[in-house]
């Protein structure tokens, strides 16, 4: 399954969850899109598991193949499988670019990475799924600092996560792996583990 390129607002309304983490999608209509969007549908256990998986997958904007591969990689790490899965997703380069505030959305962050605007430890990395380790630095190429999407993001109101830092010279750092209580509080990763282990 390829990466979804349609309206994330419709996805958010269908899932009743803000995949952009802003909540804006649900302000106007907090129900699904379409003629029957307001009808309540009773979900089975499988339905709840699938819905939770979709909420997380659309939040990070990854394909099903990448999502499953990351899930399988998490099973090889020490720790609780579901939590390690979330940590791996949170450690993606495109996500850290977003968490640093270089982009207003993960889609914009992915574009910055793919187009070669991002340096990791001083070297260009154009792979959005590149997994960062604590201590690595993330910066913009000098000529990329003046891009409109970068300037708009840097000038917007933004609460930076505690596990990343950014100095006045726009040198970002992935300080440490995040604790589970620091991000995505409305995601129940255990349901996703159950979905893939069914």
UniProtKB/Swiss-Prot annotation:
One of its GO terms (cellular component) is small ribosomal subunit. InterPro entries: Ribosomal_uS4 (IPR022801), Ribosomal_uS4_bac-type (IPR005709), Ribosomal_uS4_CS (IPR018079), Ribosomal_uS4_N (IPR001912), S4_RNA-bd (IPR002942), S4_RNA-bd_sf (IPR036986). One of its GO terms (molecular function) is rRNA binding. Residues 91-154 form the S4 RNA-binding domain. HAMAP family: Ribosomal_uS4_B (MF_01306_B). One of the primary rRNA binding proteins, it binds directly to 16S rRNA where it nucleates assembly of the body of the 30S subunit. With S5 and S12 plays an important role in translational accuracy. This is Small ribosomal subunit protein uS4. It comes from Aster yellows witches'-broom phytoplasma (strain AYWB).
